[in-house]
Amino acid sequence: LADADDGFKYVLKFRGAGQREKALIAELLGGEIARTLGLKVPELVFAQLDSAFGRSEGDEEIQDLLKGSQGLNLALHFLSGSINYDPVAMSTDPYLASQIVWLDMFITNVDRTFRNTNMLIWNRDLWLIDHGASFLFQHAWVNWKKNAEGPFPIIKNHVLLPIASELEAVN
């Protein structure tokens, strides 16, 4: 979480982390496809990370992450006061659930499960976050076309699948 020059707080997605630029591209594409479909996604912005950012950080691993992320990164507008979506405690409209499952099948998002829903409740609305693990085919370029066009069996683990009864209507 970082304060930006525009006075807002953002959740930074570091270029130097994990899958590096691929995850940021997936985050941007997945989030904007969701937004285009009418789903709620926090504002995505490009964030310039100055070389002085985190210089006083004592943890060497975090220092390495920050050094590897100097320059252009991606950030999501922080939804202050939001809470994690809990499928046990909260009800979701079946049509909305179907839209989200359809989106995650389309972008092959493996990361919206019961353990980690990657959804927030903010101002009584459901918001989607964290699309960095989307576009699964990008992680295995051998047979990429077959992988991109083939079935997506991991969708069986989707947190909203049990209530997504309107998939035909959404499709």
Go through the PLM ranges and name each one.
Residues 122-171:
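C-terminal catalytic region of ATP-dependent kinase domains
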